């Protein structure tokens, strides 16, 4: 289990919010004992990814081995890019191609379930990281995680978050997310999950046109609990107005050199269980 970072953990600003949750979670044994059985027993066809993160390379492998035989989930999202892990002092696995290769390949040999690698928005050589994750056996990529930044409370000159810095999410992250999806689309045939500022049907369409096979919504639900259902309704209306009958028709495909997108129909629809 992880207690996570000191409060306050969330701070709002005009462009979205900062969070510094610190990967707080119930831990492996409680997840096996309580969380996954509930999903198995209460959701008809669970399309859930378990998000895992380790302080060390070996911890990723321990989590995969500990969860792989359990029911109630589809696959793993390998969080290589959380900027709020105090024990790693902001050092991201996603910015080290050799670490990405070691973690993805090690997880791959330990499970036959789908593996989704979650990458960083501030990677100076994202195309290389994408290629490494692809070569080592990832089935899809999540782009992007939050972007490290800070907010200051000027009434007492201290950071607004208990941990000091945090990660940007919401509309302010959207340009970074779109850029990353576009870059990754040119570097791999894998399906891409677009993340960052998906607030409405319009932003979902933007991610699809950039190359995202699916999108994730998180911060939007903090602002408006019905954001997801309204976005779905908005997509249906958008499709009618623009004579588009299927989401796949919107998704920008990779260049011919990378062949067609490797379709994973198991991922439609899908939910991610875990904090960025």
What is the predicted function of each stretch?
Residues 4-14, 152-166, 208, 220-248:
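C-terminal helical cap(s) of enzyme catalytic domains, especially alpha/beta-barrels
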Residues 75, 79-84, 140-150, 197-198, ...:
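Glycine-rich phosphate-binding active-site loops on the catalytic face of alpha/beta enzymes
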């Amino acid at each position: 289990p992880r207690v996570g970072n000191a409060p306050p953990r969330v701070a709002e600003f005009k462009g979205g919010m900062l969070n510094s949750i610190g990967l707080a979670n119930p831990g492996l044994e409680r997840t096996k004992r309580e969380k996954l059985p509930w999903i198995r027993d209460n959701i008809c066809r669970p399309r859930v990814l378990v998000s895992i993160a380790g302080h060390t390379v070996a911890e990723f492998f321990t989590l995969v081995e500990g969860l792989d035989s359990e029911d109630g989930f589809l696959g793993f999202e390998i969080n290589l890019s959380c900027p709020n892990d105090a024990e790693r002092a902001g050092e991201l696995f996603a910015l080290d191609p050799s670490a990405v290769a070691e973690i993805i390949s090690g997880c791959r040999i330990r499970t036959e379930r789908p593996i989704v690698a979650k990458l960083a928005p501030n990677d100076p050589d994202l195309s290389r990281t994408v290629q490494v994750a692809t070569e080592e056996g990832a089935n899809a990529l999540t782009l992007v995680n939050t972007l490290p930044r800070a907010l200051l409370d000027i009434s007492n000159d201290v950071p607004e978050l208990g941990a000091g810095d945090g990660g940007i999410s919401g509309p302010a992250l959207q340009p970074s997310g779109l850029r990353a999806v576009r870059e990754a689309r040119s570097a791999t045939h894998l399906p891409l999950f677009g993340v960052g500022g998906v607030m409405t049907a319009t932003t979902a369409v933007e991610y699809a046109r950039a190359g995202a096979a699916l999108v994730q919504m998180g911060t939007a639900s903090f602002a408006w609990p019905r954001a997801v259902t309204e976005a779905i309704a908005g997509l249906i209306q958008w499709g009618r107005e623009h004579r588009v009958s299927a989401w796949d028709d919107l998704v920008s495909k990779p260049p011919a050199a990378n062949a067609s997108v490797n379709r994973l129909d198991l991922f439609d629809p899908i939910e991610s269980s875990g904090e960025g």
